[in-house]
Swiss-Prot record:
Species lineage: Bacteria, Pseudomonadati, Pseudomonadota, Gammaproteobacteria, Methylococcales
Subunit structure: The RNAP catalytic core consists of 2 alpha, 1 beta, 1 beta' and 1 omega subunit. When a sigma factor is associated with the core the holoenzyme is formed, which can initiate transcription.
InterPro entries linked: DNA-dir_RpoC_beta_prime (IPR045867), DNA-dir_RpoC_beta_prime_bact (IPR012754), RNA_pol_asu (IPR000722), RNA_pol_N (IPR006592), RNA_pol_Rpb1_1 (IPR007080), RNA_pol_Rpb1_3 (IPR007066), RNA_pol_Rpb1_3_sf (IPR042102), RNA_pol_Rpb1_4 (IPR007083)
Protein name in UniProt: DNA-directed RNA polymerase subunit beta'
Annotated EC: 2.7.7.6
One Pfam entry name: RNA_pol_Rpb1_4
Reaction catalyzed: RNA(n) + a ribonucleoside 5'-triphosphate = RNA(n+1) + diphosphate
GO CC, one annotated term: DNA-directed RNA polymerase complex
Residues annotated to bind Zn(2+) 2: C814, C888, C895, C898
Cofactor, how bound (note): Binds 1 Mg(2+) ion per subunit.
Amino acid sequence: MKDLINFLKRQTQSEEFDAIRISLASPDMIRSWSYGEVKKPETINYRTFKPERDGLFCAKIFGPVSDYECLCGKYKRLKHRGVICEKCGVEVTLSKVRRERMGHIELASPVAHIWFLKSLPSRIALLLDMQLREIERVLYFESYVVIDPGMTPLTRGQLLGEEEYQKLVEQYDDEFTAKMGAEAIRELLRTMDLHAEVVQLREEINGTNSETKIKKYTKRLKAIESMLASNNRPEWMILTVLPVLPPDLRPLVPLDGGRFATSDLNDLYRRVINRNNRLKRLLDLNAPDIIVRNEKRMLQESVDALLDNGRRGRAITGSNKRPLKSLADMIKGKQGRFRQNLLGKRVDYSGRSVIVVGPTLRLHQCGLPKKMALELFKPFIFSKLQFRGLATTIKAAKKMVEREAPEVWDILDEVIREHPVMLNRAPTLHRLGIQAFEPILIEGKAIQLHPLVCTAFNADFDGDQMAVHVPLSLEAQLEARSLMMATNNILSPANGEPIINPTQDVVMGLYYMSRERLFAKGEGMTFASVDEAEQAFLNGAVDLHAKVVVRVREVVVGEGGERTESIKRVQTTVGRALIWNIVPEGIPFEMVNVDMTKKAISRLINHAYRTLGIKASVIFADQLMYLGFSHATRAGVSFGVEDMEIPVRKDEIIQAAEREVKEIQNQFASGLVTDGERYNKVVDIWSHANDQVAKVMMEGLGVDEVTVGNGETIKQKSFNSIFMMADSGARGSAAQIRQLAGMRGLMAKPDGSIIETPITANFREGLTVLQYFISTHGARKGLADTALKTANSGYLTRRLVDVAQDLVITEDDCGTTDGLQMAPLIEGGDVVEPLAERVLGRVLAEHAVDPASGDVLLEAGSMLDERAVQLLEQHGVDNVRVRSVITCKTRYGVCASCYGRDLGRGHKVNIGEAIGVIAAQSIGEPGTQLTMRTFHIGGAASRSAAISNVEVKSSGQIRLTNLKTVVNRDNALVAVSRSGEISVIDEHGRERERYKIPYGAVLSVREGGAVKAGQIVVNWDPHTHPVISEVRGRAKLIDFVEGVTVREQSDEMTGLSSMVVIDPKQRGGAGKELRPLVKLVDEEGNDIFIPSTEITAQYFLPAGAIIGIRDGDLVEVGDVLARIPQESSKTRDITGGLPRVADLFEARKTKDPAILAEATGTVSFGKETKGKRRLIITDASGEQHEVMVPKWRNITVFEGEHVEQGETIAEGELTPHDILRLRGTAELASYLVKEIQDVYRLQGVKINDKHIEVIIRQMLRKVEITDPGDSSFLRGEQVDRSRLLEENDRLEEEGKVPACYEPVLLGITKASLSTESFISAASFQETTRVLTEAAIRGSTDRLQGLKENVIVGRLIPAGTGLAYHTERRERAKLGEVTEPETPIIDTAEVEEALKQAFSL
């Protein structure tokens, strides 16, 4: 008997595998899968409902309809299993074989597989080197194709029309073969000699210099080589046998009323079979050619529709006018097999309900309605009931549960204890969207949720619903408890800050408690302990806000974790003393002795977590919440209309603004300003007025005046309810209060442009009809935007997850010394993000050295925690090199040292952590908070562009970096480089501010000079661009022809005259060739060279340049030879928000990108063409690099100027590809991180840099081969970095030449599609193309990523699954076989075993 059970079990076991391979199926392969040929289009007999023989549901081919029963009913029961009935031919077995047995159709004429024909680039066309159009003409019987030209002048693969073919047949008779249809193409493919083609293509590639030809040949070569490597034959792309899907995968279901619901595939198969049978008949009848041809074409079309309906021509529709769902549609798209059934499955043991607040819960608990719990834990209850002997059978137990007997509730309590459940709120944007809690049984039907986890779930209680899931197995419960419990997810994985921050009511309550009020009851009292103060408060002897002195016991945790205890008297308030009562030991009193705003509370919890650990901080957070709720209730903070105090000065501010606007209108009317300028100025004036009103209003709201006994008034912080809500961070913001009590301000039109008439009213005064109408614009756009934003943000997250899903921490340390240089982020002189924040939780790549003494502060390889970061700050270190994922040398995955701290846990990252997915979630989750609009630079932005000096904000020493200067005749420094920067260093050697220095700026300080705050250190003219002489000599003006190339103009104000270069377009025929230039010569008239170069000092002058010197003037170093007026740079719309982030991650090329210098060297200009200028850079070795720049582009460099590789030479937006090519990976990383962070920072979202770096690593995982060496790669081919490095290692071991390469940047979509895993790529996008390509290449998926493993139904190789996979591999290596494999036993043996078992 045991034998039999094992035998039955073994059939269900699947063997373990390590990889999946996909390739083309040969006709013989298809026949070997098949259990018989489907010859008839019939499905089932409509009288008997039995499948027709040889039809699409035939039981003989596909297996019995019901278990162990043949169709005619002669054999029934298990004992006949394996018998084939001689009457109906059906094998007696399980009916589920109808899900796996395939059939086939022998096609009367070959048919091309549409995927290999139409999926671009067409594989068939590529192999045959013909055009897709030509091949289609052959396939659909429009022309003949020559297969074997014989001795005729024709060529193989040539197309012939009908008439042409007839003529040639008359002329040459049967010396040549030409055919039409799929047979012809199949013949061409079959007779190809792939090896010979490869040899010929390689020769042609080596023999040509044309880039396009090389590209074309390489494409073909790749295709043919992949065919050879995968043992696929080209002719298999043409089908001669068509496989038929098992019938239970295309079911036919009887509905009531005698009708049937059927899968579309059955219709499509029926069509194919009908046409195929008709074609067979016609061929037997020797029908006329034209009829046969038409039938063949129809067969081809019907097979096309079956494989991919609508790919060619019109889609075949069913009776309901809808296109039929073909095999391709089954697997692609959101509703396809991959995304609907393999990546997302429905699960059992789950329920969902509305959530309500559970203010009395502890952080690790949730309230679960009894009804739900009873249903969810049913199996556990049944087994317990049986175990206790309260029910004898499962059926009896079921009855008891349905009756809801009292014993059932007791057992439910027992089952639920210590059994966590998981709560999930859709949309699950990051891993904190699913957390585990211990259920507490409650009455009612709503789930109770702990208020502190609302932030993580992004939940509120206005009708949100949540789902409950029960982890069944012991392992699942263990994981839920140790990894997913709410108490283990205190920190946000995106930025490492606490995410269980109190919000709203709790903040309000704590803030209200901690405020001080002057002259409150009991002010100045002194208490011996906090308890005494509490007693006094409860008895009404002292007010909550009274300033009092309390004696407190404070325990502080020191550097090494040692605790120091002290007792001191502190000046505080009663409320703060009450808060101190619940604060755990180890937190200093001054953290509590402040107004408890949301930020202060967050700092408190963060500090508790870092110093006291998880347990203490969780208990503390809960206590804070209870306290906050109770005091918010007692405070009774609420507001009425009177609380929105409108500032007195509002009217005068508005009138002043209106006067200014009128003034501008007048200027415009008299033609002094353009309409654009007028509009910008008006918008500017109003936004300024708005800010003023807001400021005045907040000053009014935020201050109360208290009258002292002697009649004086003292100001104190206001207790206005609205102000308190905003100030505490509980609800609302200054901007919202401004609309309530200030003025609503400027509104935007739906296209994003600003309406220049603002809404001067506020909501308290009420809006006029016109103002209300204007404001509807903005409101409606806001709603439409939100809908779009959600979809776009979700799509961005999906792409990010897909590109990063296979990145896992795989080892502890890769041992690299490489890393990224980190410095504080400084913008416009202000520190945006200090170094401490940027490097926290990273590992040092080099020693951190004290800039003053040169001592090593921290060793390389040490983790920078909060203490280490403080140390760096104290010693004024402003530049450290830290390890980064981008520079990590681990082949597959990343090492823990390059990643650093796991932000969600606060310690070094564990091996097996899926950092890719976490990074994608961290970047994608705040996506919905980003804006969608593009910003129009108006008013303020365009004005601020005209800065003309640098005024330092702090005192210190000057440091110049990267700056090339010359000394002019006034003994001042003049900058002659563009990438120079000036920074101010304080006495500790810390960098305080940093500014860019433009070309031609005059510096009034030197390196190391001391400056005072407010001193102006650099000046320049923002409106013109100077040309500065770097040598001394006499000026010689060449090609200066008055009235032709230059014209004299005098300044009305000063009366000085100067010459202006005329635009070549406006010159006569004679002047077109002339090019005005200034040349410097010595006294003898010889050329002078620019120092340390071979280039003569001559400066070509562009159109519009103003020349202030005359021929023969003496020119000193640093003199200005000419000025080029800068039209203020054209205001481009800057893309902001979500679209900007998407553009950066997709690495899109911008429309008019900046042009960067290709090499380091000296600039000169060559011969101009009609619309472009030729810019030449001569490097140190004398090699010339040419760039053609359109004339309208603003070129920022001059003749003779020295540029560094990667420096901007024509303005525009930088393209990441250029940065990578010319400045390297580190620069690219810092550019992308900065740009992406700018967008998020604007919305106040904090994301750690390392998440962005993770995605960038994935964008950089491909390299382009520049020189294949002895490898099998081709020049220009893109391959995975890890594959290339492995290949190079192999070549080096064999002593051959390794391949040379350079990194390429791919956008996230492209990177996802070009991963090594075809399963992952196919489930992402463009399923057809990915699968087609993979099949031809015979790709093998090694199942390394997470997605592939989910799809094949295994544990993911990350987290706890990593151990499982490692163990499995070890087992396989040791050669342990889990089950002894025995061959399938034949039927006689089975019968014997059965007889023995049942002793028949």
